[in-house]
Amino acid sequence: MSFPRGSQDRSVGNSSPWWPLTTEGSNGSQEAARLGEGDSPLGDVRNEELAKLEIAVLAVIFVVAVLGNSSVLLALHRTPRKTSRMHLFIRHLSLADLAVAFFQVLPQLCWDITYRFRGPDWLCRVVKHLQVFAMFASAYMLVVMTADRYIAVCHPLKTLQQPARRSRLMIATSWVLSFILSTPQYFIFSVIEIEVNNGTKTQDCWATFIQPWGTRAYVTWMTSGVFVAPVVVLGTCYGFICYHIWRNIRGKTASSRHSKGDKGSGEAVGPFHKGLLVTPCVSSVKSISRAKIRTVKMTFVIVSAYILCWAPFFIVQMWSVWDENFIWTDSENPSITITALLASLNSCCNPWIYMFFSGHLLQDCVQSFPCCHSMAQKFAKDDSDSMSRRQTSYSNNRSPTNSTGMWKDSPKSSKSIRFIPVST
């Protein structure tokens, strides 16, 4: 993609019109470059083979994203279990992914079929606004979800202070902020008249930038707001989360070793309460930490998928505007075009990540369809067998109520402390 210098204010086309960041590309790069230089365009043509591939890829992404995220929303709606804060964030992240499917992928699919934008000026501006709005919403919903995990792990006492209200406020803020930050699209894109086919004129939805710095400023700002800033916040939150978990595990390991050493020497060391030595029971703490760590792992995988899917797209965007020798055409760089299209795979991956880490969501989703009742019964049987094994293990590990001395608590024990008789 080359941006000719010299004009103060120039209209340029949208790269494979769906992509809201790039200003020239697969559908308009040759025309825009030549129009900016004052030359005649080669004609209103495009690489039809690449266009067919784009249409096929976008169609698959759209169907998979809609089915996957709709299934998650249906499972969350029909689940008989009590919904948690994490379920609330998953619901809104699924809504953001559906926004990507309907506001990004679907317009691009229609645009690739028609080649030129078919619609009035207001529709051009609305489509461009919604495309960037979906990108902001998906990124910022990940940020607030990770921030919630940071608060739950590093500041657990704050989760007792109206957690539902705080979660809803965080989610509402991300939606509103995404809408506001995407409004400049209304003033950048519009339907303008362009010249093709040796004098023939047509209309398309293009962007207008002040040269030479307008394009670079726009792409750099969008990359920073949609990708760089969220990744920095996500990385910082996960740095604190990992440090807190590591410190917690190290403390438990040291406490366990200290306890074993005291048993071997026959010495009792610890705080006293009414003639009894009080020691923390690690089992119940482990069960709570295990649940938190599972949600942290799920959020980490979602964030990793977001970075892996979107990083190539933003790298190409920055490369295209800062390297004057970079040229993007349909026939010469089909791999770059497809790599950009695959960025929306992130919206397809998220539903399966939810179901993998929350097995009951898959079960509730299957139960929503009458044709899958046999599979749902299999899930229910597996859950019943698993619960039976846990109850058997619990009863075998418990000591009779009239026993004295020490015993090994079951991992599912609700006791948080144990009392060891100490001679006084």
From Swiss-Prot:
Gene Ontology terms: biological process: calcium-mediated signaling; cellular response to hormone stimulus; cellular response to water deprivation; G protein-coupled receptor signaling pathway; grooming behavior; maternal aggressive behavior; maternal behavior; myotube differentiation
Gene3D superfamilies, per the entry: Rhodopsin 7-helix transmembrane proteins (1.20.1070.10)
Membrane in keyword set: yes
Lipid-conjugated positions (S-palmitoyl cysteine): C371, C372
Region described as Disordered: 1-40, 383-416
Consequence recorded when altering Y115F: 17-fold increase in affinity for oxytocin. No change in affinity for arginine vasopressin or 1-deamino, D-Arg8-vasopressin
InterPro entries: GPCR_Rhodpsn, GPCR_Rhodpsn_7TM, V1R_C, Vasoprsn_rcpt, Vprs_V1A_rcpt
Matching SMART domains: DUF1856 (SM01164)
Glycosylation sites: N27
Residues in coiled coil: none
In-chain residues carrying the UniProt-annotated modification Phosphoserine: S410
Tissue: Localized within gonadotropes of the anterior pituitary of the brain. Broadly distributed throughout the cerebral cortex.
Protein location: Cell membrane; Cytoplasmic vesicle membrane
Phenotypic consequence of N27Q: Reduced ligand binding affinity
Molecular functions (GO terms): peptide hormone binding; V1A vasopressin receptor binding; vasopressin receptor activity
Residue intervals annotated with topology Cytoplasmic: 77-88, 148-168, 242-299, 358-424
Membrane topology: Multi-pass membrane protein
Residue ranges, Extracellular side: 1-52, 111-125, 191-220, 320-337
Further comment found in the protein's record: Overexpression of AVPR1A in the brain increases the duration of social memory.
Name the record gives this protein: Vasopressin V1a receptor
Organism phylogeny: Eukaryota, Metazoa, Chordata, Craniata, Vertebrata
The encoding gene: Avpr1a
